[in-house]
Amino acid sequence: PGGNQYYDRWQAWLYPGNSTGLAANGKMSPFFYTNYYKFIFTANEAIDIANQSEGAEEMMGIAKTFRALCYLDLARLYDALPAKAPERPAYETELEAVKGLTVPIVREDTSMEELENNPRVSREEMFKFIFEDLNTAETLLANYTPATKNLPSLAVIYGLKARAYLWLGGFTESYAEVPTGDAAYRLAAEYARKAID
C-alpha cells in the first residue's frame, strides 16, 4: 500500500534490539519534539491570522485547541519524572536539574529574540497556558459544529481538559493556579463526563 514495502512492520530503528535510536541522544528523542513544534508553529500562524481577521473566531478556537493538544502531549512526554532504577547518582543529579520542568512555550507573538533565550517552563506555568488556550477555545467554539471529523468540537476540548486534569492528579505538589491531587482528579471526572454527554 502506498509504495511502502514495510507498511506491516516496524522500521529498523524502532526494533528493540537496536536501542541506540531510543537513547536520550538518539533519533527518537527529538522526533516528537520537532514534529510537535512544527504543528505548534502552524497553529501559531493560524492564531496570528485569526487575530488580524474579522469573524475568524472559529479558526482561533480550532487553532488554540490544536496548540493545547500539542503542549499537553509535550508536557507529558518531556516532564522529567523519577524512574525506579538501580542506584545511579548521575541520574538523580540530572533529574534534580530538570524536575518539574516541561518544554519551552512558543506563542504566536514570540519574537526571534525571545526564542533565543526561551527556557523550559514549570509544570504549573505550562498547564496554566494549556488551560488558557482550552478555555478560550471552549468559548469560541461553544456554538460550532465541526464540518469534518478532524476538527475539534466541545467534546474534544472537554476530553483534553480531562486528560490534563488526570495528569495533574498524579502530583502532590501544590500550585497556586492549577489543581493537583484529588482536586484535579475530580475535575478530570467532571470533564470526562462532559465529553461523553
Cite the ranges covered by each PLM segment.
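Surface-exposed, gly/pro-biased binding rims or lids
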Residues: 113
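General structural signal for secondary-structure boundaries
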Residues: 109, 119-122, 153-156
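An aromatic- and glycine-enriched ligand-binding surface/loop that stacks and positions planar moieties
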Residues: 1-8, 28, 32, 83-103, ...
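Residue-level recognition of alpha-helical structural elements
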Residues: 55-60, 150, 177, 181-184
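Short helix/loop segment immediately N-terminal to the Walker
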Residues: 142-151, 175-177
